[in-house]
Amino acid sequence: MPLFPPCLPFARRLLPLSLAAALLAVPVMAPAAEETVRSFRIAAAPLGQALRQFAGQAGILLSAEGGLTQGKRSGGVHASLSIPQGLQQLLAGTGLVAVQLPDGSYIVRLAPVPLRADLDGEGAGLQVLAPVTVLGDNDDGYRRASSAAASRNDTALRDTPQAVSVVSAALIRDQDMRSLADAMRYMPGVGTAAGEGNRDTAVMRGNSSTSDFYLDGMRDDVQYYRDFYNIERVEAIKGPNAMVFGRGGGGGVINRATKQPQWTNDGEASVSLGAWRNRRAALDVQQVFGTEVAMRVNAMAENSDSFRQGVNVRRSAINPVLAWRLSPRTSVVASYEHFRDDRVTDRGLPSYRGRPFETDPSTFFGIAGSSPSWAYIDALGVTLEHDLGGGASVRNRMRLADYDKLYQNAFPGPVSADGENVTVLAYNSATQRRNLFNQTDVEWTVDSGSVRHRLTAGLELGRQTTDNLRNTGYFTTLGDNVTHISLPISHPVTDLPVTFRPSATDADNHGVADTAAIYLQDQLRFSSRWQAVAGVRYERFAVDFVNNRTDARIARTDTPWSPRVALIYQPVPALSLYASVSQSFLPRAGEQLASLTPSNAVFEPERFRNAELGAKWEVTPLLSASAAVYRLERSNVAVTDPIDTTRAMLVDGQRSEGLELDVNGKVQAGWSIAGGYAWQRAVLTATQAATAVEGATVAHVPRHSLSLWNRYDFSPAWGAGLGLIARSAVYASVSNTVVLPGFTRVDGAVYFKPHGHFQLQLNVENLFNKKYYASAHSNDNIAPGSPRALRMTALWRF
C-alpha cells in the first residue's frame, strides 16, 4: 500500500516550496510613521502587563522578549500622545526602547547604550533577542512566540527546549475552528481518535489520551467536547513532562489559554450560518471600570444539525472574567464558566473486510434517538499575583470545577461475513467529578557570578472526587436478556426501545484521588549562547477506590520523582539548538481514575521517557520555524504472563519515534502561513494481548501527516485563505486488521471587511468534496469526514 494516496505527491512537493517561500520572503513595504495622538490610561504595573494594556489601547502589534520585561515595572502613561511618545514614556527608566519594524509593528529591545557586560565576556552592547508577542489587535500572522504553560512561567518558545505547537487566535478565527480536532490538525505529530462520539481524544507521539487537557495550565481532564468561544490560543506541549504537569501526559498535553481582560472598552459579536442548519452566535465584550478594575465576558450559543442522519448538537456557555489591581504590585483575576453541551452520540460506521464499510457517509448505524450525550460544567478560577521586588514574584492559582457527564449510545458492532447484516449494541455511562486544584509558584531571577538563574519553585495540591456508573442496554421486546440485535445493512437503523440496567460487570464506583507535589526548576543562562534547564518534581498521588457493587475497597499511593534536563545552544540570537530528556508516569488508576483493580494495584505506574533534539529559528520577528526528532519509550506496561496466565507482569511495551517540522507566522505584509509535517513510527515492543502483538503499529498514528494554511490579504477589504490537510493510512486499532485510507482535504476561505467594524467571512471545508475517513475509535467505530460544508460568519466590532 502506498504511504500517500495518489494526490499526496503534490502535497509533498508543495510543503518544501511553501516553507522555502516563507523563509526567504521579507517584508517589502513600510507604513508611514504613526503620529496620531491617542489618549492612554495605563496605571503603574509590571512592565509586561503595562505593555499588553498599551498594545490593546493603541491597536498595535507589540513584541518583547520575555526575559527583557521580567522583574521590571512601568510608571504608566496618563496622557494624550502619539504611539512613539507613549511607548517612550511607558519604558522610561527600564533600559529598554521600542523600535518600529518595516511592517508597522513594534518590538521592545535593549537600549543602545550598554547596560551590563555580556555574560560570556565577549563584550557589551545591544543584543536583539527574538520577540515574544504580548498583545496586538493587528494581524501578526499565526505566530506565537511564548508559552506560559510549557515551563510554568512566560518563556519564549525559542528558549523552551521542547517541541511546542501553538494555534493562535488568528488561525482559530480565520478557519472558524470550533473544536480541538480542528486545531490538532495543524499541530505536527498530534492526531485525533473518534472518542466514541462523545469526547476529545488526542493522539500525541503515539499515545492516545482522553485526559491530558489543561485550561490555563490547570487540569481539565473529564471526557467531553471542548469549545473555542473563550479561547485565545491552543498549545500542544509535546513529550512527557511530569516535572511541569504531574501525572499523565505520556505523549504530551493540550493546553487552552483563555481570553483575559485587556483593559480596553470594546467588543465583538458574531453570527454564523452554514450547511446542515449550522447556527451559532458569540459575544466578546470588555469594559474598564476606572484604573483598577476590568471585566471581559465571552458567551456562545449553538444549535446545529449534521451531515450525519439524526445527529445534532446544542451548546451554550458564558465566561465572565474580572481583573482587579489591588495595588501597583498585586493583582487578582477571577473567572467563572458555565458550559452546556447536548448532542447525539455518533459512533460512526462499521468496517468490512479490512476497510470502512462502503456506504453513504450520512448513514447512521444504530438508534440515534437512544443515543443522547451531555456535559454540564461549572468552574471557578482565581489567580493572585504579587511582585515581591528584586526580581521575585509569587502567583497562586485555584480552580474548582464540577462536571456532570453522561453519554448513551446504540452503536454498530461487526458486519456479518456475508456483508448483509450489522450487529447493534447499547450502553450508557455517567460520570460526576469535582476537581479542586491549587498551584503556588514563586519565581526569582538572580545572578550568581556570570550565571543568570531564573528559579521557579512551587507547590501543587489537588483533590478529585469521581463517581462512575455504567448500564448495559437490553432490547427487552426481544427478550429480557437480549443485549444485541442484528439489522440489515441496507437499513441499519431501528426504533426498538432499549432498557438500560446494570449487568454484573458494569462499573459502579466512587474514587478520591489526592495530589500533593513540590517542584523546583532552574533556567540557567551561562552566556549569550548557552542555556540549560534543570528541574525535578516530587509527587504523592494517592487513590482510594470503592466498588459500590461489591463494597470492595482498593487503595494505592505512588511517590515518584520526575526530572527534566535540557541544554540549549544559540549560535546566533535567532537560532536555538537543544537537547532534552524528560519523563512522566501514569498511575494504575488510569487516566480517568477508574481502572484500579486488586490485580494491578500492586504494580508501579507506567513510565514514559522522552529524548529529543530540536532547532527553533526566528526567521523574522513575525515568522518562526522549528524542527524536532524524538524517541519516546513506554515501560511498566502490565500484560499477562505467558508462562502463568493467572499472573501479570510488566514489560517495556511501546516505542515511538519521529520527526516534526513546524512553521507559523507572517511571511510578508498580507501573507500569513501555518503548517507542519510529521513522520512517525509507533510500535508495540512486547505482546500485550492476543490482538496486540509485538511489532504491531499503534492505532491512529499515520506514518506521514501534513498541514498547510495560507491567508493572503489583497487589500484592506479583501482576503482569501487556502489550505490542505493530508495524512497517510492509519490502523483503526492495534489489531492492525482495519485500515483507514490516506487522504488529502483542501479547505478555503474568503474575507470581506468593508470598514473597520464589520467583516464577512466564508469558510469552505473540503472544497473538492473528497470522501474520506477522519478517525476511528475501534475497528467498527469509524468517523467519516464531512462532505463539502460552507459557513458564513458576520462579525461586528464595537
Give the location of each predicted region.
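Acidic, small-polar-rich N-terminal luminal/periplasmic segments of exported/outer-membrane proteins
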Residues: L61, V128-T264, L613
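Outer-membrane beta-barrel translocator/receptor signature
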Residues: Y229-E232, M243-P320, L326-T330, D378
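Acidic/polar loop-and-plug regions of large Gram-negative outer-membrane beta-barrel proteins
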Residues: E302-S306, I318-D387, L400-R433, G479-A507, ...
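Structural signature of Gram-negative outer-membrane beta-barrels, strongest in the C-terminal barrel
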Residues: A323-S327, R433, R452-T456, E460-Q464, ...
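Face-selective signature of the C-terminal outer-membrane beta-barrel domain
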Residues: L380-Y403, A426-V546, K666
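Membrane-embedded beta-barrel scaffold of Gram-negative outer-membrane proteins
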Residues: L384-R399, Y403-F411, L577-Y578, P605-A686, ...
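Gram-negative outer-membrane beta-barrel transporters
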Residues: R631-E633, L650-S735, F768, T793, ...
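C-terminal beta-signal and adjacent terminal beta-strands/loops
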Residues: A726-S733, Y751-F798
